[in-house]
Amino acid sequence: EEREYRIIRTDGQLRWLSDKCFIARNADSTHGPIIVGIAEDITEKKQLEGELQRLATIDVLTQSSNRRYFFECAQREFDLARQYATPLAFQLLDIDDFKRINDTHGHQMGDQVLQRVAQCGSSVLRRGDLFGRIGGEEFALLLPGCQPDLAEQIAERLQREIQRLVFTSPDGQRFGVTISLGVTYLRASDPDLSAMFTRADAAMYTAKRLGKNQ
């Protein structure tokens, strides 16, 4: 038999142990079987497993959910919202003129922009909301149980937070960034999550055509 469990040491440290037990027959038939147990500290192994699991779900650059994990979670929330007829809001945002930022200020500056925008996205989340980077300069928010008026407030707050960002390039130039954002809500007629994504994507590109920063 093999078991894994946690213990708390006398110094307060949490450790993981692997405990293996097996029965060995005694060559001396006058005595019963011998029970052998081996305990091994597997704390480092567990920590590594946890880190690998974390890395499988996040975008390393921005520390937000990666595309695969975001849509896995979004699909579960979509199914729950359909099942229980609860509201669900979906938002897509794209950093305006990001290629120009990279070309003008360099890719390291572009990475910094992505990181700061992701921080803004995480800052507006409620408990249970999901934020992820789903493309180069494209992010998504999923807001379970969120009515349209509240979702609009969250979108406006996110716009304001990003508009406040100020960056300084290596040559001393100061610049800001804006986003174009598309918002949609679950409809009874939506057959799947992709229907919401398509609407949000269309709304986002409409915002870009109408002048961006909206």
Predicted feature residues:
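PAS-family sensory domains
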Residues: K20, H31-D41
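PAS-associated C-terminal
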Residues: I38-E40, L93, P144
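PAS-associated C-terminal cap
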Residues: E40-G50
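Short regulatory alpha-helical coupling segments
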Residues: Q53-A56, R67-P87, A118-R126, P144
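Conserved nucleotide-binding and Mg2+-coordinating catalytic segments in signaling enzymes
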Residues: Q53-E72, L93-H107, Q115
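A short pre-motif secondary-structure segment
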Residues: L130-R133
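Catalytic-core segments of nucleotide cyclases and related cyclic-nucleotide turnover enzymes
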Residues: P148, E152-A155, T184-N213
